[in-house]
């Protein structure tokens, strides 16, 4: 369901059936964490997305139960509803993607039901971009996130692409493209990536891969 290569060379596999599998690519050894600590809070361990902090702790999107923080040393789970900062955020059934935005020093969570959550860990502050705060956003279901080389945040939604610029202004991609053949229909955007030349590749639900010249 999700893949992450952590800084220590481990591959983390979030599995739809439950739990996390780790692969040691240096020693070709597999480790499996069934996330029993998670099952104390909810009757599933189906991992939709995963992000590792510098200290090794994990943030995970859990199918049907939103977001959790996993302390790797203590093997303890903190659901977002019990988190001292994130407990004030809205409801979400899961988190589809998690990235760190360098420009603003924030963790960004692509939620299924509430747009994008932003969490500055050092400042202890969180805020949201959704259809209430930004009516120009046409869909609250966010599948993917990308911070480009200019510091803009790209939002891949169920209804196309939106861009949060460095001034925190939100635009739809179709407002910004200069060529009509680069405009996107209202379709799901599953993944985005930037190449070394600054082009953005966009994986769509049924329109193949689009390449956008920024």
Model features per residue range: what roles?
Residues 1-214:
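Carboxylate-rich, polar loop motifs that coordinate divalent cations or form catalytic acidic clusters
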């Amino acid at each position: 369901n999700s893949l992450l290569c952590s800084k220590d060379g481990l591959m983390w596999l979030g599995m739809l059936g439950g739990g996390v599998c780790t692969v040691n690519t240096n020693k070709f050894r597999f480790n499996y964490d069934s996330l029993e600590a998670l099952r104390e809070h909810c009757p599933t361990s189906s991992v939709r997305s995963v992000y590792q902090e510098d200290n090794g702790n994990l943030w995970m999107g859990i199918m049907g139960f939103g977001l959790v923080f996993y302390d790797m040393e203590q093997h303890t789970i903190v659901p977002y509803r019990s988190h001292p900062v994130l407990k004030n955020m809205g409801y979400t059934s899961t988190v589809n993607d998690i990235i760190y935005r360098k420009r603003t020093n924030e963790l960004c969570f692509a939620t299924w039901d509430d747009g994008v959550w932003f969490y500055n860990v050092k400042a202890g502050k969180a805020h949201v971009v959704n259809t209430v705060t930004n009516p120009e956003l046409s869909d609250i279901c966010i599948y993917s996130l990308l911070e480009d080389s200019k510091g803009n945040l790209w939002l891949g939604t169920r209804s196309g692409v939106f861009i949060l610029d460095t001034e925190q202004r939100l635009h739809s991609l179709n407002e910004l493209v200069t060529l009509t053949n680069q405009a996107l229909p209202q379709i799901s955007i599953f993944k985005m990536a930037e190449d070394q030349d600054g082009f953005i590749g966009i994986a769509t639900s049924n329109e193949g891969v689009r390449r956008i010249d920024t």
